[in-house]
Amino acid sequence: MSKNRVLNNKKGVTLIYVLLVLVVMSLLSTAIFTLFVSNVRQIEIQEDSVKAHFIAVSGVEVAFAALMQDNKSLLNDHFNVALNATVTPLTDVVTLDNGEADITISSYVDDGLRFVRITSLGRLTGSTTTRELKMTFRVEFPEVQTWE
């Protein structure tokens, strides 16, 4: 008889339902918060990647401008040489507001034509993110460029 009385007594059922709802809501809140934090981190990584990319672009553009200034004197004196001549690569580091670009200007011969390749490695200050860009053009026609 006492067994039936215990089963029919529903005084504590509401408390169990409330606790169950609180546990479920806590789990959902934790999952949403974890997803939010993960998305914020991903956005920061992508933002750093874009910034490093544009630092690398700036490095290529600075190097190209240096080759083109003074009536292309650096380009003609250093890179416009015989096809069998060895050209020593030029290197420099350009410091920008939010990072650095390691620049290498090298030359190679392909199908009897001399090409110049500007390689720029963009590094963002305060981050390990780096991006590398390359621009290639023929010595005779620097206006026609190929980006890699």
Predicted regions located by residue number:
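N-terminal leader/signal peptides at the extreme start of proteins
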Residues: 1-11
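Acidic surface patches and DE-rich sequence motifs
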Residues: 9, 96, 124
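Aliphatic-rich helix starts adjacent to a transmembrane/signal segment
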Residues: 13-55
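Surface-exposed loop/turn motifs at beta-strand-loop junctions within extracellular Ig-like
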Residues: 23, 122-126
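Low-complexity, Gly/Pro-rich coil/beta segments used as flexible assembly/activation regions
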Residues: 50-117
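Residues within well-ordered beta-strands of beta-sheet-rich folds
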Residues: 119-121, 136
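Low-complexity, S/T/G/P-rich flexible repeat/linker segments used as non-globular hinges
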Residues: 126-148
